């Protein structure tokens, strides 16, 4: 059934829809299956996303038609479909009238992902008007709270030097805590890796107690505040709360030094909202493990990493992993800096829409995946600032002189970039950074040709066979 006469209105202007403030706008890259027309398929897509089905039903009235989602722009050559969803379509809490990401996804990314006439459809951007945006929690705290704990300025406080304890699984409580202590002697921030929780060989209660003690010892030894991000992910909201309460109680006087990590993609929006609302005074660390199943450029269904991170800010994440923008080991490219801008700025341009956040707190980019001291200056130059949390596992524990030197090398790389000093020049005066070149010679050869001569390091590579 061709539903284009009802669910398509190409006379609508995007600027008028935005000015009206009554529609959520979504941009999809969509392709119909062979034998289906583009506009007719887009209309069916909008119908399935809102008030329609595959046949006309007798219960439809004029009010129902008034809240139809409408296709307002198509560009078949670019496979672009834009749809306007009336704000009234989206579900609200009965307890407080707030909006929910679950409803947003159910409409904009629900049944339309399995339609028989659609080859693929992926959301690349969305726009929320102020009236709807204001119904989301947004972040309660962000990196400024961590800077305050660290004794830094709460604006432009710079890089938080962090790591992930490796191996990600297999360490028992005592060696895990000792690894934390070792890194904290040179760095700021440690996070649980996403699978670490309450394994039989590493009970959470035992591990957290030892980590809290390791933090106290490191702070006493260095005279500096330290930070820890504890994984409280669970299926059951009551388990999330129980874990969070135990962690904060155990850290005691250092509770403000603790972030609470939730695997937001695998555990879902309810887990993020539970943590955001139950623990509003603590940094909510949104880990996105699993997101690549839908966000990868190789996937033509789902939504992009940009959309995922934008939703995280609405939900209230204090920070979310954003990848390394092509400078680390994970999938990404330099243009991904637009994700960081959308998370941190009060108004930012996306792939299709310019979004105003109306004063909603910023969400902090968290950088991880193959980063080390040698890769960082290029990353900062691409982004234009260093107001991020870095969690470098191999970049710290893979340093030739150990994790303390690894942490210091990361900090020195940031300081070199901040001060506008070429990395090799800075390394001549800072041994940990200099030794990072020997720790990661493959990266050094690629990024800094001639580094051995500059640093006076003997070239021990075997000559290639003739």
UniProtKB/Swiss-Prot annotation:
Listed binding positions for substrate are 111, 168, 288, 321, 368
What are the protein's GO molecular function terms?
magnesium ion binding; monooxygenase activity; ribulose-bisphosphate carboxylase activity
Cite a single GO BP annotation: reductive pentose-phosphate cycle
- Catalytic residues? 166 (proton acceptor), 287 (proton acceptor)
Feature type site, description Transition state stabilizer: 329
Matching InterPro entries: RuBisCO, RuBisCo_large_chain_AS, RuBisCO_lsu_C, RuBisCO_lsu_C_sf, RuBisCO_lsu_fd_N, RuBisCO_lsu_N_sf, RuBisCO_lsuII
Residues found modified as N6-carboxylysine: 191
Q: What is its EC number?
A: 4.1.1.39
Q: Which reaction does it catalyse?
A: 2 (2R)-3-phosphoglycerate + 2 H(+) = D-ribulose 1,5-bisphosphate + CO2 + H2O; D-ribulose 1,5-bisphosphate + O2 = 2-phosphoglycolate + (2R)-3-phosphoglycerate + 2 H(+)
| Chain residues that bind Mg(2+) | 191, 193-194
* Cofactor binding annotation: Binds 1 Mg(2+) ion per subunit.
Q: What class of enzyme is it?
A: lyase
Look up the record and name the cofactor or cofactors this protein needs: Mg(2+)
Q: Which of UniProt's keywords are assigned here?
A: Calvin cycle, Carbon dioxide fixation, Lyase, Magnesium, Metal-binding, Monooxygenase, Oxidoreductase, Photosynthesis
Family to which the UniProt record says this protein belongs: Belongs to the RuBisCO large chain family. Type II subfamily.
Q: How does it assemble?
A: Homodimer.
The free-text function statement in the UniProt record for this protein reads: RuBisCO catalyzes two reactions: the carboxylation of D-ribulose 1,5-bisphosphate, the primary event in carbon dioxide fixation, as well as the oxidative fragmentation of the pentose substrate. Both reactions occur simultaneously and in competition at the same active site.
Question: Could you share any additional remarks the record makes about this protein?
Answer: The basic functional RuBisCO is composed of a large chain homodimer in a 'head-to-tail' conformation. In contrast to form I RuBisCO, the form II RuBisCO are composed solely of large subunits.
HAMAP family to which the protein is assigned, alphabetical? RuBisCO_L_type2
Concerning PANTHER family, the annotation shows: RIBULOSE BISPHOSPHATE CARBOXYLASE, RIBULOSE BISPHOSPHATE CARBOXYLASE LARGE CHAIN
- Official protein name in the record: Ribulose bisphosphate carboxylase
């Amino acid at each position: 059934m061709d539903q284009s006469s009802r669910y398509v209105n190409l006379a609508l202007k995007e600027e008028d829809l935005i000015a009206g403030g009554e529609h959520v706008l979504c941009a999809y890259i969509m392709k119909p299956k062979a034998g289906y027309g583009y506009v007719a398929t887009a209309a069916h897509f909008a119908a399935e996303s809102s008030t329609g089905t595959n046949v006309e039903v007798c219960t439809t009235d004029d009010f129902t038609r008034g809240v139809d989602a409408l296709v307002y722009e198509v560009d078949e050559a670019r496979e672009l479909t834009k749809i306007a969803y009336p704000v009234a379509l989206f579900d609200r809490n009965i307890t407080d009238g707030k909006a929910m990401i679950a409803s947003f996804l159910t409409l904009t990314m629900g049944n339309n992902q399995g339609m028989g006439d659609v080859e693929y459809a992926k959301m690349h951007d969305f726009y929320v008007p102020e009236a709807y945006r204001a119904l989301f929690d947004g972040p309660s705290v962000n990196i400024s709270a961590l800077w305050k704990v660290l004794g830094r300025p709460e604006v432009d406080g710079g890089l938080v030097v962090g790591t992930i304890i490796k191996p990600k699984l297999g360490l028992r409580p005592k060696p895990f805590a000792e690894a934390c202590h070792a890194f904290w002697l040179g760095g700021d921030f440690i996070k649980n890796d996403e699978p670490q929780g309450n394994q039989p060989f590493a009970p959470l209660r035992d591990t957290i107690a030892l980590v809290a003690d390791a933090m106290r010892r490191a702070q006493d030894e260095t005279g500096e505040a330290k930070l820890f991000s504890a994984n409280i992910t669970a299926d059951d909201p009551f388990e999330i709360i129980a874990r969070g309460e135990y962690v904060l109680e155990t850290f005691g006087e250092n509770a403000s030094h603790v972030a609470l990590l939730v695997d937001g993609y695998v555990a879902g929006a309810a887990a993020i909202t539970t943590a955001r609302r139950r623990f509003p005074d603590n940094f909510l660390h949104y880990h996105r493990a699993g997101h690549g199943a839908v966000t990868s450029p190789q996937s033509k269904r789902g939504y992009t990493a940009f959309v995922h991170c934008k939703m995280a800010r609405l939900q209230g994440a204090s920070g979310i992993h954003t990848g390394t923008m092509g400078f680390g080991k994970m999938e990404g490219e330099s243009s991904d800096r637009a994700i960081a801008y959308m998370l941190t700025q009060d108004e930012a341009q996306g792939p299709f829409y310019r979004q105003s956040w109306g004063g909603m707190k910023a969400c902090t980019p968290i950088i991880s995946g193959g980063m080390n001291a040698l890769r960082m200056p290029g990353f900062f130059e691409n982004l234009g600032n260093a107001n991020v949390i870095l969690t470098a596992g191999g970049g710290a524990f893979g340093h030739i002189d150990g994790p303390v030197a690894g942490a210091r090398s990361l900090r020195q790389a940031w300081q070199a970039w901040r001060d506008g000093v070429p990395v090799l020049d800075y390394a001549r005066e800072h041994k940990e950074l200099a030794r990072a070149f020997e720790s990661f010679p493959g990266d050094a050869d690629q990024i800094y040709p001639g580094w051995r001569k500059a640093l006076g390091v003997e070239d021990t590579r075997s000559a290639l066979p003739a």
